[in-house]
């Protein structure tokens, strides 16, 4: 399996601009089918504590972008997104993994929040270490 890491200068809290940057990089990279593409934590917004403004549902625009990217290129796509909370709770800093058909394969909510950066004041920590198989290889997502 090929693994590709995508690092770029994120446009602060501007999802469409960041989607366009990822699209351009992937088009240029010409990744082989089945590649695992790794996008940064909160790649569509930057590491923002403005959770209420940037949070979206698990089927929101960033998840749709990732699913479409995976299906269009026949690759796995893993990236960070802020997911809206249930009523009365804080949003979660999550990573979503889509398979080459664009289906959500796994999701993980960051467990160890970055307290010095104020993350714990704005986000709800995750509780589970979502394990999954990728090409018969046991894997686990982590967000630093």
Regions found by a protein language model. Give the residues of each.
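Cys-nucleophile CN-hydrolase/nitrilase-fold catalytic domain and related Cys-dependent amidase chemistry
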Residues: 15, 23-101, 107
């Amino acid at each position: 399996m090929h693994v590709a890491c995508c690092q770029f200068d994120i446009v602060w809290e501007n999802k469409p601009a960041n989607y366009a940057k990822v699209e351009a990089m992937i088009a240029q990279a010409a990744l082989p089918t089945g590649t695992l593409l790794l996008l940064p934590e909160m790649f569509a917004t930057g590491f923002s504590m403005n959770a209420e403004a940037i949070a979206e549902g698990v089927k929101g625009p960033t998840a749709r972008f990732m699913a479409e990217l995976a299906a269009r290129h026949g690759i796995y796509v893993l990236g960070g997104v802020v997911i809206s909370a249930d009523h009365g709770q804080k949003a979660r800093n999550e990573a979503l993994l889509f398979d080459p058909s664009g289906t959500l394969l796994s999701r993980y909510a960051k467990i160890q929040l970055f307290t010095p950066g104020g993350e714990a004041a704005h986000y709800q920590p995750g509780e589970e270490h979502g394990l999954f198989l990728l090409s018969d290889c046991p894997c686990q997502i982590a967000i630093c």
